Curated annotation (Swiss-Prot):
Organism: Cereibacter sphaeroides (strain ATCC 17023 / DSM 158 / JCM 6121 / CCUG 31486 / LMG 2827 / NBRC 12203 / NCIMB 8253 / ATH 2.4.1.)
InterPro entries, sorted: Hydgase_Ni_incorp_HypA/HybF_CS, HypA/HybF
A biological process from GO: protein maturation
A Pfam family annotated for this UniProt entry: HypA
Keywords assigned: Metal-binding, Nickel, Zinc
Molecular function (Gene Ontology), one example: zinc ion binding
Gene name, Swiss-Prot/TrEMBL: hypA
Protein name from the UniProt record: Hydrogenase maturation factor HypA
PANTHER family named in the record: HYDROGENASE MATURATION FACTOR HYPA
Transmembrane intervals: none
């Protein structure tokens, strides 16, 4: 379960930010996760609760914001949202697409005190 190691990375970032900005508690942590990031959200939620014990984010509410998949179509030159990596271009039906978004995961923001 790589979600555990993802949460360990989040814990490190939270700790760094707590020291840098002087907060003691994270109330809400918002993550943006792309459609193609390969993250199992239920497993991430479980791992988050376990890994954050003893940190500034212990007991924090985790909110996950879904980011769409995006691709550049080499046939029409446009960028469009796609549901699956192998979908045709929704604008022109072309099949030569390069994914340009949807594989990211990042902390959007935190509510702290």
């Amino acid at each position: 379960m790589h979600e555990m190691s993802l949460c360990e990375g989040i814990r490190g970032i939270v700790g760094d930010q707590a020291r840098r900005h002087g907060f003691a508690t994270v109330k809400v942590l918002r993550l943006e996760i792309g459609r193609f990031a390969g993250v199992e959200k239920a497993a991430l939620g479980f791992a988050f609760d376990v890994v954050m014990r003893g940190s500034a984010a212990e007991g924090a509410r985790l909110e996950i914001l879904d980011l769409p998949g995006r691709a550049l179509c080499y046939d029409c030159g446009e960028e469009a949202a796609i549901e699956d990596r192998f979908d045709p271009c929704p604008l022109c039906g072309g099949g030569r697409l390069m994914p340009v978004g949807g594989d990211e995961m990042r902390i959007k923001d935190m509510e702290v005190q």
